[in-house]
Design a protein with these regions (language model features):
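Active-site rim/loop-helix segments in enzyme catalytic domains that contact anionic ligands
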Residues: 1-98
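Metal-dependent de-N-acetylase/amidase catalytic core
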Residues: 1-6, 82-156
Length: 156
Protein backbone atom coordinates (compact mmCIF):
# COMPACT_ATOMS: atom_id res chain seq x y z
CA UNK A 1 0.00 0.00 0.00
CA UNK A 2 0.96 3.62 -0.45
CA UNK A 3 0.33 5.75 2.63
CA UNK A 4 0.36 9.55 2.68
CA UNK A 5 0.34 11.43 5.97
CA UNK A 6 -0.08 15.18 5.59
CA UNK A 7 0.54 17.33 8.63
CA UNK A 8 0.81 21.03 8.99
CA UNK A 9 4.12 21.42 10.82
CA UNK A 10 7.25 19.32 11.16
CA UNK A 11 6.47 17.06 14.16
CA UNK A 12 2.64 17.06 13.90
CA UNK A 13 2.48 13.74 12.04
CA UNK A 14 5.34 12.33 14.09
CA UNK A 15 3.58 13.13 17.38
CA UNK A 16 0.08 12.14 16.29
CA UNK A 17 0.57 8.94 14.28
CA UNK A 18 4.19 7.75 14.27
CA UNK A 19 3.14 4.39 15.71
CA UNK A 20 0.65 3.80 12.92
CA UNK A 21 3.16 4.82 10.26
CA UNK A 22 5.80 2.57 11.82
CA UNK A 23 3.42 -0.39 11.51
CA UNK A 24 2.79 0.53 7.88
CA UNK A 25 6.54 0.58 7.14
CA UNK A 26 7.01 -2.77 8.92
CA UNK A 27 4.37 -4.44 6.77
CA UNK A 28 6.10 -3.15 3.62
CA UNK A 29 4.02 -0.09 2.78
CA UNK A 30 5.55 2.93 1.07
CA UNK A 31 5.00 5.86 3.44
CA UNK A 32 5.29 9.52 2.51
CA UNK A 33 4.99 12.25 5.14
CA UNK A 34 4.39 15.81 3.97
CA UNK A 35 4.58 18.89 6.16
CA UNK A 36 2.69 21.79 4.58
CA UNK A 37 4.26 24.48 6.76
CA UNK A 38 7.92 24.92 7.58
CA UNK A 39 7.62 25.37 11.36
CA UNK A 40 8.88 28.95 11.21
CA UNK A 41 6.98 30.09 14.32
CA UNK A 42 7.44 26.95 16.40
CA UNK A 43 9.85 28.31 18.99
CA UNK A 44 9.76 31.27 21.35
CA UNK A 45 13.52 31.90 21.32
CA UNK A 46 14.98 30.54 18.07
CA UNK A 47 14.29 32.94 15.17
CA UNK A 48 12.60 31.61 12.00
CA UNK A 49 15.73 31.89 9.83
CA UNK A 50 17.51 29.44 12.18
CA UNK A 51 14.48 27.33 13.04
CA UNK A 52 13.29 26.49 9.51
CA UNK A 53 16.44 24.59 8.45
CA UNK A 54 16.73 23.00 11.90
CA UNK A 55 13.21 21.58 11.78
CA UNK A 56 13.60 20.48 8.15
CA UNK A 57 16.77 18.58 9.06
CA UNK A 58 15.12 16.98 12.10
CA UNK A 59 12.21 15.82 9.93
CA UNK A 60 14.53 14.39 7.25
CA UNK A 61 16.61 12.54 9.84
CA UNK A 62 13.52 11.14 11.55
CA UNK A 63 12.23 9.99 8.18
CA UNK A 64 15.52 8.23 7.40
CA UNK A 65 15.40 6.39 10.73
CA UNK A 66 11.82 5.29 10.12
CA UNK A 67 12.17 4.42 6.43
CA UNK A 68 9.76 7.19 5.45
CA UNK A 69 10.05 9.74 2.65
CA UNK A 70 9.62 13.26 4.03
CA UNK A 71 8.51 16.23 1.95
CA UNK A 72 9.17 19.60 3.56
CA UNK A 73 6.96 22.59 4.15
CA UNK A 74 6.02 24.99 1.38
CA UNK A 75 4.24 27.60 3.52
CA UNK A 76 5.28 29.69 6.49
CA UNK A 77 3.41 29.01 9.72
CA UNK A 78 0.04 30.80 9.84
CA UNK A 79 0.31 31.49 6.10
CA UNK A 80 -1.75 28.53 4.92
CA UNK A 81 -5.33 29.08 3.80
CA UNK A 82 -7.92 26.46 2.90
CA UNK A 83 -9.79 28.72 0.46
CA UNK A 84 -6.76 29.47 -1.69
CA UNK A 85 -6.35 27.81 -5.10
CA UNK A 86 -2.54 27.90 -4.92
CA UNK A 87 -2.60 26.07 -1.58
CA UNK A 88 -5.06 23.47 -2.86
CA UNK A 89 -2.98 22.90 -6.00
CA UNK A 90 0.15 22.20 -3.94
CA UNK A 91 -1.75 19.56 -1.95
CA UNK A 92 -3.24 18.08 -5.15
CA UNK A 93 0.30 17.66 -6.48
CA UNK A 94 1.40 15.95 -3.24
CA UNK A 95 -1.48 13.51 -3.49
CA UNK A 96 -0.87 12.83 -7.17
CA UNK A 97 2.83 12.31 -6.48
CA UNK A 98 2.26 9.85 -3.60
CA UNK A 99 -0.65 7.97 -5.25
CA UNK A 100 -1.90 6.91 -1.80
CA UNK A 101 -4.29 4.12 -0.90
CA UNK A 102 -5.28 6.21 2.11
CA UNK A 103 -4.42 9.59 3.62
CA UNK A 104 -3.92 10.60 7.24
CA UNK A 105 -4.25 14.25 8.25
CA UNK A 106 -5.43 16.59 11.01
CA UNK A 107 -8.88 16.56 12.54
CA UNK A 108 -10.90 19.38 10.93
CA UNK A 109 -12.04 20.44 14.43
CA UNK A 110 -8.50 20.98 15.73
CA UNK A 111 -7.70 23.97 17.94
CA UNK A 112 -5.04 25.48 15.66
CA UNK A 113 -5.95 27.45 12.51
CA UNK A 114 -3.03 25.93 10.57
CA UNK A 115 -4.25 22.42 11.41
CA UNK A 116 -7.86 23.08 10.41
CA UNK A 117 -6.71 24.71 7.15
CA UNK A 118 -4.57 21.63 6.45
CA UNK A 119 -7.50 19.28 7.10
CA UNK A 120 -9.77 21.25 4.77
CA UNK A 121 -7.11 21.48 2.06
CA UNK A 122 -6.49 17.73 2.20
CA UNK A 123 -10.21 16.97 2.07
CA UNK A 124 -10.76 19.23 -0.95
CA UNK A 125 -7.54 18.25 -2.73
CA UNK A 126 -8.22 14.52 -2.32
CA UNK A 127 -11.17 14.86 -4.69
CA UNK A 128 -9.52 17.35 -7.03
CA UNK A 129 -6.49 15.04 -7.37
CA UNK A 130 -8.72 12.41 -9.01
CA UNK A 131 -9.65 14.64 -11.95
CA UNK A 132 -7.63 13.53 -14.99
CA UNK A 133 -7.92 16.91 -16.71
CA UNK A 134 -6.95 19.02 -13.69
CA UNK A 135 -3.95 21.16 -14.71
CA UNK A 136 -1.22 19.92 -12.40
CA UNK A 137 2.52 19.43 -12.75
CA UNK A 138 2.27 15.69 -12.11
CA UNK A 139 -0.39 15.04 -14.78
CA UNK A 140 -1.17 11.77 -13.03
CA UNK A 141 -4.63 11.52 -11.51
CA UNK A 142 -4.93 9.81 -8.15
CA UNK A 143 -7.74 7.52 -7.08
CA UNK A 144 -10.35 8.62 -4.54
CA UNK A 145 -9.19 7.26 -1.20
CA UNK A 146 -10.28 7.26 2.44
CA UNK A 147 -9.05 10.07 4.68
CA UNK A 148 -8.31 9.27 8.32
CA UNK A 149 -7.92 11.96 10.94
CA UNK A 150 -5.16 11.94 13.53
CA UNK A 151 -6.15 13.51 16.83
CA UNK A 152 -4.38 13.34 20.15
CA UNK A 153 -6.39 16.16 21.71
CA UNK A 154 -9.72 14.35 21.97
CA UNK A 155 -8.17 11.29 23.58
CA UNK A 156 -8.51 7.70 22.55
Amino acid sequence: MNVLAIGCHPDDVEIACAGTLSKCVKRGDKVVVAHLCNGSLGHVVIPPEELIPMRANEAREAGKLAGIEVIGGVFDDLDIYSDNAESRNKVVELIQYAQPDFIITHNPDDYMPDHTATAKLVFDAAFTATLPNWPSKTKKAAKLVPIYYMDTLAGV
